[in-house]
Amino acid sequence: MNKHLKHLCVVSVISVAAIISPKVFSQVSASIACPDYKRGPTNIPGQKVGKKVGKALEAYTNDLIDEALNILYDIDTSNTFDRAFTDRFIGNLLATQNGKARKSIEYLQKAVAPNKLNDSEQVGTIKLIADLSLQEEQYDSALKYYKQWLEVTCKEDFDVYFRMANAYYQTQKYAEIIAPINKAIALAKKPNKTAYALKMTSYYSRKMYKETIQVQEETVRIFPDDKGQWTQLGFFYMLVEDHKKALSTFEMAYMQGYLSKPAEIKALSQLYSMNNIPVKAAKILEKYLKSGLVKTDERMLTSVASSYQQAKEFKEAADFYGQSAKLSSDPDLYKKQGMVYYALEKYSSAIVALQKALDGGSDKKGPIHLAMMQANFDNGDFKSAYKHVKEAKKDKSTARNARSWEPYIKEKAKNRGIKL
């Protein structure tokens, strides 16, 4: 059982001894703060019940809880206060035992039902029922008794409002979370991270992303040293496609050393790319592929290659397309490598890579033959260029372009005395 609740129950049991002393009843209870509150009459158990309660208390103080309970179970009284007092004592004792919380709640509910307990005991028991109900996942009951406690005491209590918000969360009544969690946040002696998380979850679960982000922004301001808050805010910005704010947030987190997960590094790289900074997208991902934080696979290598290509860093792009192609069964990666080599005017390397794409079974044969024609032509190999232009003519997607190249190749070859 929850240690805090168990402590409360023990305190409540010990208070039974004090309640029997008439001196206690001269004290004004501070349990109720309502402006028009007038303390009710003070009651003490009748002599017969009081004796048995005393014996039960003695057994309890000697750690004989079962014996104490048997004494209390044996009490038979028609007096409403004595019955409520006894049921409260039984409920408190049961609450200290593992697995007896639900039975405890039943006795405590019977104790408060007639509203005959002394004021402080009445409100304390109402609160205990609520806490035990929350522990036992009886959320509707917990909410009922927390609300009753607030109504009876006129008090503002962080724990009560926080637990009410939690009960609403557990029952997926997300809209209901806001009122109590706002009060809990206002009452907290110091900022409570979980309270802000509950508030954020309320909005997020209802797809109210603007409000979700506002709460998360506030959370980052209050807990700037919590790295998880930064990345969560960044991901929320990505969710609403505010890529500039997302990048700014992830960059600040990165500079503070807060990015430690592969998904976070990948997100930063992706955001650089989305914000048209492909060279940074490539370099950050390359760095953490080398460190081992991000697993090296075809997808990551291709991402680095693509970013370098966008940045017109063709040498690096060709290298990473080649690495990716070796890990993959995708021949089109060799095609991409070949096109990058062509941009670098490395025609021989382009031809080798493009041939690997063909040998690997690429279904883009027409475009590959056309690219190989161009690479061979620029490399001065008109015979090979002519061979590939004829192959390119067989593909509908490249036939027209190939036909326009064919006479040009023939003319160049003729001018140089080369027979095709």
Residue locations for each model-derived region?
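Alpha-helical adaptor scaffolds
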Residues: 298-312, 318-363
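Structural motif corresponding to the intra-repeat A-B loop/turn of tetratricopeptide repeats
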Residues: 62, 97-98, 136, 171, ...
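Solenoid-like repeat scaffolds
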Residues: 37-44, 73-81, 112-118, 147-155, ...
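TPR-repeat structural position
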Residues: 65, 100-101, 139, 174, ...
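N-terminal leader/linker segments that initiate helical-solenoid repeat arrays
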Residues: 2-126, 134-140, 144, 170, ...
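Residue at a conserved register position within TPR or TPR-like alpha-solenoid repeats
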Residues: 59, 94, 133, 168, ...
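Generic helix N-cap/helix-start motif at coil->alpha-helix transitions
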Residues: 44-53, 81-87, 118-127, 153-162, ...
